[in-house]
């Protein structure tokens, strides 16, 4: 009777080992065909931020404790600052003695009178907030929350408003304090013209105001290098998805120059002016222009090459760790 070799365990083992060896050899041969460019992913600025994630800095922690009070702690007299006249869409407004209905405008203050349950068409009472407006008129906001939900909520957002207590807390913490500005774009105050003055210079905080719903804090500063001149920057608070311009993105508590002792003085002056030159390192360029929107890092015959891309067609090319070419 003829024996089937495929049933021989030794034969099966030999063929398995042989196929494994062929696969490994083929994989090694194929990997040698790659130049490095084909397998190099585009790294976004978000990837860079994740790599640099660490314990919160002093700047990240400085205003982190300032948060709106939960609704259960709201008392009569609580103030909200109007940021947009579209708030009239979400408010029920009464008329004054002359029969005029006033639309709240940006900068107006609404003062809470009551937070009380009111009947609805579904017979399920909801908490309605009653405010007095800047003209003494009565304004009502329907929260859509029953009393239990109202008391259990940690926060509530009234559209087109800013919590005035939060602005007061930031003002108490910042006014009169000497800081260093790291934000590049600012505006003249109170005119509001956009400017890009020098960064990493000392400033003194002179005032704090309510801003917009997206950028709720305006910090008014007097730069050391432009005394008697007021500038302003917008700032966010908290740790939500919209907190993209918090204190640590705008200010430094200490002189940033002390963190970079190896940077030459003439290069530091370029950085403060938002300029670059050939031969600067990636860190120096990042300090001057900010983080790129994306970069590609690939090996080449000349060494490691990095390409940084910014908005408006700006790009930087680094070779072996120094700036070799750029377009601004």
Residue locations for each model-derived region?
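Bacterial N-terminal signal peptides that target proteins for export
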Residues: 5-21
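C-terminal motif of bacterial Sec signal peptides marking the signal peptidase cleavage site
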Residues: 30-32
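Residues within mature, well-folded domains
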Residues: 34-85, 99-108, 112-328
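Short, solvent-exposed loop/turn elements at domain surfaces
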Residues: 89-92, 120
């Amino acid at each position: 009777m003829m024996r089937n070799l495929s049933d021989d365990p030794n034969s099966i083992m030999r063929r398995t080992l042989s196929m494994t060896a062929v696969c490994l050899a083929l994989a090694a041969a194929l990997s040698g065909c790659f130049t490095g460019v084909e397998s190099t992913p585009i790294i976004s600025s978000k990837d860079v931020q994740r790599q640099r994630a660490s314990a919160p800095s002093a700047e990240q922690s400085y205003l982190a404790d300032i948060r709106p009070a939960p609704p259960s702690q709201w008392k009569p007299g609580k103030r909200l600052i109007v940021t947009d006249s579209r708030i009239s869409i979400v408010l029920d407004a009464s008329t004054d003695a002359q029969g005029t209905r006033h639309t709240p405008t940006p900068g107006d203050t609404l003062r809470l009178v009551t937070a009380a349950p009111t009947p609805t068409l579904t017979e399920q009472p909801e908490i309605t907030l009653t405010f007095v407006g800047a003209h003494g008129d009565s304004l009502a906001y329907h929260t859509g929350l029953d009393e239990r939900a109202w008391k259990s909520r940690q926060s509530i957002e009234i559209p087109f408003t800013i919590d005035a207590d939060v602005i007061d807390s930031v003002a108490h913490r910042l006014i009169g304090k000497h800081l260093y500005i790291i934000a590049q774009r600012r505006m003249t105050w109170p005119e509001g013209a956009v400017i890009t003055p020098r960064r990493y210079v000392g400033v003194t905080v002179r005032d704090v105001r309510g801003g917009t719903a997206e950028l709720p804090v305006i910090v008014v500063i007097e730069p050391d290098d432009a005394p008697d001149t007021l500038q302003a920057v917008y700032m966010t608070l908290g740790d939500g998805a919209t907190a993209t311009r918090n204190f640590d993105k705008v200010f430094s508590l200490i002189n940033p120059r002390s963190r970079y002792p190896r940077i030459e003085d003439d290069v530091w002056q370029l950085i403060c002016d938002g300029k670059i030159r050939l031969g600067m390192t990636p860190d120096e360029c990042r300090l001057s222009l900010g983080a790129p929107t994306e970069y590609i890092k690939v090996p080449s015959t000349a060494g490691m090459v990095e390409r940084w891309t910014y908005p408006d067609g700006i790009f930087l090319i680094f070779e072996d760790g120094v700036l070799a070419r750029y377009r601004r």
